[in-house]
């Protein structure tokens, strides 16, 4: 039967010598050389001597490793006598003629950068003693030098994801900011007055969208009235509330929603809207107005100062151009959404992603192959829908890291919970991809202690890469 050779065994010296388990492993400042010699089939004439020198070379540099000498029977006796006379220790590794079996050869030499592209050759010399013809040869053992840099670049660390908690009741809301027009000091909705028709159509379309969707159930309707900040506050509050009530009455009459679900409130004088409008306007006095609003806390005094700017003309201009837009009613519909399975979720994520909980999105993402376009897209949608959620940000960072997009990953990681094992693992991945191996190792160790499987795998891989390997 044919002999079974060790893995990656190579034949030398006309198939009489077998080498296996060859390893060139750089670690720090050292190169570890290891291989197994099988000399069981080697025959050497009694008077002859075989010299084997593993040679590390890149064509320009040569580093010969420890020589191996195999002597024939008579030659060995002469060799030993010679050593005894000179009282010298042999520098070579002597293989006794009757022990030509299998042995492990290991050497550690200082590592130099040129060695990353070197090859290991076997220089063979069988002496011409006893009237034999001398034989010289050089054969390739390997050109595979395993450097830290090569091993690290081949490693793809695993990112960690967090499965979001189940949202038992999915509460959502839609809001429309209506700028309804009322005759001066009146609070009755006239559907054909100024721009009211368009605004009311928009409110109705919001109601239709929610009421016509069998997956949604209306739970409440909030109507909040805002006033433009001129005149007495008490009067503004009273008028705004009346106008908000007018919208409620109109909707109760025209929409199929119980009046019990409506809640009317006064949102206050719309100073925020005024600041926003001023900032985007080209009024030359806008900075003066903005400073008054920012620095004058008393309501009546603030209004008086605004009226006095530039002799009153800028204020009159604002009354005409800006203030009408500040009188608004926010109409907000609160509703709940049914739960979806993965197949439904795959459709909803494209049509109306806000109807999905983060947990449902996570299930949908993981129904696609990891790292696929659809998988990545779902996590991207999740963080857009829930921009402040820590889990959504952690998972979006994980996706970015898996694509080696470090800038995007950092942006999301800042908003994630820094105390989770998943965050620690992903910090390790970030450090690894950034070339900071020691910090990566520390982060993986931290996460692995907390039981994170991705970190345990990453740590094991990194330890294998960085550990000394001697065959």
Predicted regions and their residues:
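N-terminal targeting segments with Sec-dependent signals, encompassing both cleavable signal peptides
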Residues: 1-471
């Amino acid at each position: 039967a044919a002999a079974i050779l060790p893995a990656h065994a190579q034949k030398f010296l006309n198939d009489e010598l077998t080498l296996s388990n060859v390893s060139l492993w750089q670690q720090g400042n050292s190169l570890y050389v290891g291989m197994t010699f099988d000399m069981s089939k080697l025959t050497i004439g009694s008077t002859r001597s075989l010299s084997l020198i593993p040679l590390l070379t890149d064509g320009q540099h040569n580093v010969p490793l420890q020589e191996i000498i195999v002597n024939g029977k008579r030659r060995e006796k002469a060799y030993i006598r010679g050593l005894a006379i000179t009282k010298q220790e042999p520098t070579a590794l002597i293989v006794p003629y009757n022990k030509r079996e299998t042995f492990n050869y290991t050497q550690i030499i200082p590592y130099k950068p040129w060695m990353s592209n070197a090859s290991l050759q076997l220089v063979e010399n069988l002496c011409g003693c006893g009237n034999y013809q001398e034989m010289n040869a050089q054969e390739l053992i390997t050109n595979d030098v395993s450097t830290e840099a090569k091993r690290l670049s081949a490693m793809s660390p695993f990112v960690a994801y967090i499965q979001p908690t189940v949202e038992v009741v999915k509460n959502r809301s839609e809001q429309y900011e209506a700028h309804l027009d009322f005759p001066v000091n009146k609070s009755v909705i006239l559907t054909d007055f100024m721009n009211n028709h368009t605004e009311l159509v928009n409110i109705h379309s919001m109601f239709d969208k929610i009421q016509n969707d069998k997956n949604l159930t209306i739970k409440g309707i909030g109507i909040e009235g805002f006033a433009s900040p001129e005149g007495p506050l008490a009067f503004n509050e009273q008028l705004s509330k009346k106008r908000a009530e007018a919208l409620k009455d109109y909707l109760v009459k025209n929409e199929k929603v119980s009046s019990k679900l409506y809640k009317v409130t006064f949102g206050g004088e719309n100073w925020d809207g005024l600041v926003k409008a001023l900032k985007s306007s080209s009024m030359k006095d806008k900075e003066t107005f903005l400073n008054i609003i920012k620095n004058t806390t008393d309501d009546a005094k603030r209004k008086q100062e605004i009226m006095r700017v530039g002799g009153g003309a800028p204020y009159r201009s604002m009354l005409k151009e800006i203030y009408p837009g500040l009188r608004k009613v926010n109409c907000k519909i609160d509703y709940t959404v049914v739960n979806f399975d993965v197949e439904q979720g795959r459709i909803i994520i494209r049509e109306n992603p806000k109807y999905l909980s983060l947990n449902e999105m996570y299930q949908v993402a993981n129904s696609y192959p990891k790292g696929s376009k659809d998988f990545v897209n779902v996590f991207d949608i999740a963080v857009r829908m829930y921009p402040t959620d820590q889990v959504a940000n952690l998972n979006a960072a994980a996706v970015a890291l898996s694509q080696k997009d470090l800038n995007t990953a950092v942006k999301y990681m800042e908003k994630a919970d820094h105390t989770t094992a998943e965050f620690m693992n992903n910090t390790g991945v970030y450090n690894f991809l950034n070339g900071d191996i020691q910090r990566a190792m520390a982060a993986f160790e931290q996460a692995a202690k907390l039981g994170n499987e991705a970190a345990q795998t990453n740590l094991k891989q990194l330890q294998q890469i960085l550990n000394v390997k001697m065959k």
